[in-house]
Design a protein with these regions (language model features):
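Non-catalytic, conformational "gating/processing" segments within enzyme and secreted inhibitor domains
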Residues: 153, 158, 165, 179, ...
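Bacterial N-terminal signal peptides that target proteins for export
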Residues: 1-10
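M16 family metallopeptidases and their MPP-like homologs
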Residues: 50-52, 57-74, 81-82, 99-149, ...
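Active-site His/Glu-centered metal-binding helix of metallohydrolases
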Residues: 81-89, 317, 580
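Hydrophobic, small-residue-rich alpha-helical packing segments that form membrane-like cores
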Residues: 160-228, 232-246, 255-264, 268-282
Length: 944
């Protein structure tokens, strides 16, 4: 497609800006072609399919079925059935009765909840089977058969339906927090007169617990049908054969006669602004959402050049607008804590779009937030964006697409699957990244800043406005009513709003060029296929070039020490330590504040950041290959010249206090605080931050600690992994790393914070709007860390996940899910295992007792053979996939360089050698019953 075609497309795009001309009046444009590497088709019965051969990851495939069906299609007495049906898809089908599907897939390394899952929305339901090993043709065929059964053969047995009612009721209980109640209160007002007003996917518990069995079957057979279904299969297989299989298998499904019309429910327009307000005793912040509604681009236009141009303009507008918002929040007394602006779907609807402004305010700061975010919209409406802002946004868009283009041969199966799901559900274009990149390169010079300004001004309007205001319900906090909100907006319109002044520095990143050092020694690493350099300043560099990605270089510099070298029992110092990672990022680097640095780096794929953890300090950086020297400059500055910005720190303090003042009253915060206090014996570093703590934080001390931790490059190992050439990297390493200050000191890890010993119970009542109990049990101890022990603890963790799903979730119907976590530290040989879940307070003790009993059964008897086999198969599959991940090798090398060994060498041999008897002996050694902490928050309904 040439520049002339793009310019002609612009004509249509600007017709579209005027709220979309009717399709019959608009000049017709051809749809962009579908990527020739995709097998796309529609069967005679109406079913759509997408098939693509792809080898990232190797020997793996994705199987998805997308349904243009969701809660929006429910009748009043069916509310919740779309979501209920999604659950039932995992409880028996024609070819996989009962739990045989789950068992079969898990036996092949496909883990439920990780590789096997689904979701239900207002207008869509999507199921997936991910990371399927394709070497096993029977497994591939079976995954297609699972999709077939989900399409037309879910069993829906009475007994299975009844058993799932409790699970969904507990899912509702888990989700019923302040955000959920806010949705339930505001959506009916925002969507008054539309089906969207009362179709939250979770439904009503009255329907969920009482609907007749046949109602679910009727809903299934009415809406799960070929014309609403898309099959998406991506992976390492023969695409010809896969396409033929799909045609044969899914072509058998009959399209129902006299099928019900799939209605896309409209959202009515409104001349007068709609105002939705809700306050909640557990809300953590004041938030305003302002929607300027407009009609969406017609589906038939989304797949043309018009759709691509509009997406481009939305992209650059979003970048420019949100950069301004970020700049505002860097200043003290900003009118809002955080903000965002974008154009897209009107909240949850597919049939109405909106230009959306979001601002999070302080207590009693709703009017300030509204005025602040509207003032920025007004500034754009009057003056538009500047040419220099647009140049940076355009460069960013081009850089993003360039990176995607360079990585076109490394794009993962799941990314293609998600793209094609959106194409099936929403329409649009999928011409392939080669064409998209060429389009962007042609569009960006053809679309001027004036065109972008004309476009964004068309989106800013008082007509069709919806305003949602939400926040905490507490004494001393008041909110404006609708009249006051509208008056505030009018006041902004009457203000003398000044145009935005774009201050851009032309100074170099580094004001004084460093004096380069040298690589004094180069040897081949003993494992991992690495090269090791010793630098003239004593720093060590480990290099692992890879071909896993074509345009990604990562660097991790690590050193022993961290918090452990400081007095973590000092309450004031602890505040500095735990806020350090946030605060050091506020100021930018060198002579550039954060906003200025963001402008200087526009169009570059590059970052560098410092962080401090309990046992190490680290600098992580990444870049596209073209930005390697820029990344190295940022690394140099991260070590030598953190920029101080007192205004940004003052703004951060204000925002942090405003955020914490309400969050500290939420049940989630209170439970987290109780858990950490109990687990770590009230250690100041582990306790949750409170609003009153913020003023005690010392910017001076934080910068001092950061400088101390980066003062000696010789105590660091610099690990490079990615798409680089060693010879090309060498001069940058010599200039920007070998030049770093260093000395002969070498630090070790100090004393780590320990978990409390003994049997400890912390059970307390917590008033809540919707009562639920949260249960956490933590077993801990000490054990020699090595690969074998690490693997056995990981196996136990994953086995218990299976056991708890089967018992606490499925048999008891007592919770949406039990979370498990195992942690094993190579630093001090400490381990812990925890399980946690939400439940009905009446079931709290019974389920807690059973959870302990199920764990001890596995400890004493060993895992069941079937569970043991499932977990090992998954671990072997995951390990094979990890072999081509840069992040995996970065972590393996990090652990090895710090002296903690590596979890890759002999992984498969060690895992395969572990037996059930080994598991039993190991578990008994760990779970002696001496050290167990239980924290239980029992919810009680708040008194009115």
């Amino acid at each position: 497609m040439n520049l002339r075609m793009v310019k002609s497309g612009l004509v249509l795009a600007f017709l579209a800006i005027a709220q979309w001309v009717p399709a019959q009046q608009a000049p017709q444009m051809e749809a962009l072609p579908i990527d020739p590497n995709v097998r796309y088709g529609v069967l005679d019965n109406g079913l759509t399919y997408y098939v693509r051969h792809n080898e990232t990851p190797k020997n793996r495939a994705e199987f998805h079925i997308a349904q243009k069906v969701g809660s929006i299609l429910e009748n009043e007495d069916q509310r919740g059935l779309a979501h209920f049906l999604e659950h039932m898809a995992f409880n028996g089908t024609e070819h996989f009765p009962g739990k045989t599907m789950l068992n079969y897939l898990e036996n092949n390394g496909i883990k439920f909840g990780v590789d096997l899952n689904a979701y239900t929305g207002f207008d869509e339901t999507v199921y997936r089977i991910s990371n399927v090993p394709t070497q096993n043709q029977n497994l591939v065929d079976s995954c297609l058969l699972v999709l077939y059964d989900w399409a037309c053969a879910i069993s829906l047995n009475d007994k299975d339906i009844d058993e799932e009612r409790g699970v969904i009721h507990e899912e509702w209980r888990t989700r019923a927090d302040a955000d959920w109640r806010t949705w339930e209160a505001t959506v009916p007002v925002m969507f008054e007169g539309s089906q969207y007003a009362n179709r939250m996917p979770i439904g009503t518990m009255e329907v969920v617990m009482n609907f007749p069995y046949q109602a679910l079957r009727d809903y299934y057979h009415k809406w799960y049908r070929p014309d609403q279904q898309g099959i998406i299969v991506i992976g390492d297989f023969d695409a010809d054969k896969m396409e033929a299989q799909i045609k044969e298998l899914f072509g058998k499904i009959k399209m129902p006669e006299n099928a019900a019309e799939r209605i896309y429910y409209n959202v009515p327009d409104n001349k007068e602004p709609i105002f939705a307000f809700h306050k909640d005793k557990e809300a953590a912040y004041t938030r305003v959402d302002i929607y300027m509604k407009h009609d969406p681009m017609p589906r038939e236009m989304r797949g043309t050049i018009n759709g691509a141009i509009t997406d481009y303009m939305n992209g650059v507008v979003g970048i420019m607008f949100n950069n301004r918002i970020t700049e505002i929040t860097q200043k003290p007394d900003a009118p809002f804590i955080a903000g965002a602006i974008f154009d897209g779907d009107f909240f949850v609807s597919k049939t109405k779009s909106a230009f959306t402004l979001i601002a999070v305010g302080k207590d009693n700061g709703a009017i300030d937030a509204i005025k602040g975010i509207m003032r920025e919209a007004e500034r754009i409406d009057r003056y538009g964006f500047t040419a220099s802002e647009y140049d940076r946004a355009r460069a960013t868009m081009l850089s993003n697409y360039e990176n995607l283009y360079k990585e076109r041969n490394n794009r993962k199966n799941v990314d293609y699957a998600e793209e094609y799901i959106r194409h099936f559900i929403d329409g649009g274009y999928i011409p392939g990244i080669e064409m998209e990149y060429n389009l962007i390169k042609q569009m960006s010079p053809a679309i001027t800043v004036d065109m972008v300004n004309q476009y964004v001004k068309s989106l800013i309007s008082e007509d069709n406005m919806v305003i949602s205001l939400t926040g905490p319900d507490k004494e001393g906090v008041t909110y404006p009513d609708k009249a006051q909100v509208l008056a505030a907006i009018k006041e902004v319109e009457a203000e003398e709003v000044a145009p935005y002044v774009d201050k851009v520095s032309n100074e170099p990143l580094i004001s004084k060029e460093p004096v380069a050092g040298k690589v004094t020694k180069s040897v081949a690493g003993k494992k991992f296929g690495t090269t090791e350099w010793t630098l003239s300043n004593g720093a060590k560099v480990v290099l692992k070039p890879t071909d896993f990605k074509s345009d990604e270089i990562t660097m991790l510099a690590v050193s022993k020490g961290g918090y452990s070298l400081y007095n973590t029992s000092d309450p004031t110092l602890a505040l500095d330590l735990k806020s350090l990672n946030e605060v050091v990022e506020l100021g930018g680097l060198g002579q550039f504040g954060k906003t200025d640095l963001m402008k200087v780096l526009a169009g570059k794929q590059v970052s560098s950041s410092f962080s401090l953890s309990e046992a190490q300090e680290s600098v992580f950086a990444s870049c596209a290959t073209k930005d390697l020297e820029t990344m190295m400059q940022l690394v140099y500055l991260t070590f030598t010249d953190l920029h101080r910005d007192d205004e940004a720190f003052a703004a951060w303090k204000e925002q942090s206090k405003a955020a914490l003042v309400n969050y500290a009253n939420t049940p989630q915060y209170i439970f987290s605080d109780s858990l950490s206090a109990t687990l770590y014996n009230h250690n100041p570093l582990r306790r949750q931050m409170k609003a009153e703590d913020i003023d005690q934080i010392s910017y001076d001390r934080i910068l001092q600690i950061a400088k101390e931790r980066t003062a000696n490059a010789a105590d660091y190992t610099f690990i490079f992994v990615g798409s680089f050439n060693t010879d090309s990297l060498k001069p940058y390493v010599e200039k920007y790393i070998a030049s770093l200050p260093a000395n002969k000191n070498r630090e070790k890890v100090g004393k780590l914070i320990e978990t409390q010993k003994g049997i400890i119970n912390n059970n307390y009542n917590q008033p809540m709007e919707t009562a639920k109990s949260t249960v956490y049990a933590i077993y801990s101890g000490d054990q020699k860390y090595d690969l074998r022990n690490y693997l056995m603890l990981s196996i136990l963790d994953q086995v218990m996940d299976i056991v708890y799903t089967e018992t606490i979730r499925e048999e008891e119907g007592g919770t949406y899910g039990v979370g498990t976590m195992a942690d094993f530290s190579p630093v001090d040989n400490s381990w812990l295992f925890l399980f946690g879940f939400d439940t009905n307070p009446q079931d709290e003790k019974r389920l807690t007792d059973r959870a302990h009993a199920e764990l001890m059964k596995v400890v004493n008897e060993g895992p069941r053979e079937k569970d043991f086999a499932k977990v090992k198969e998954y671990m072997l599959k995951k390990h094979a996939q990890n072999q081509r991940e840069n992040s995996y090798w970065r972590e393996i090398i990090r652990s090895n360089e710090l002296g903690y060994g590596d979890n890759d060498t002999n992984y498969e041999e060690t895992l395969n050698s572990i037996t059930i008897d080994d598991m039993k002996a190991f578990s008994k050694k760990l779970f002696t019953g001496k050290d167990l902490i239980e924290v239980i928050m029992t919810g009680v309904e708040k008194a009115e």
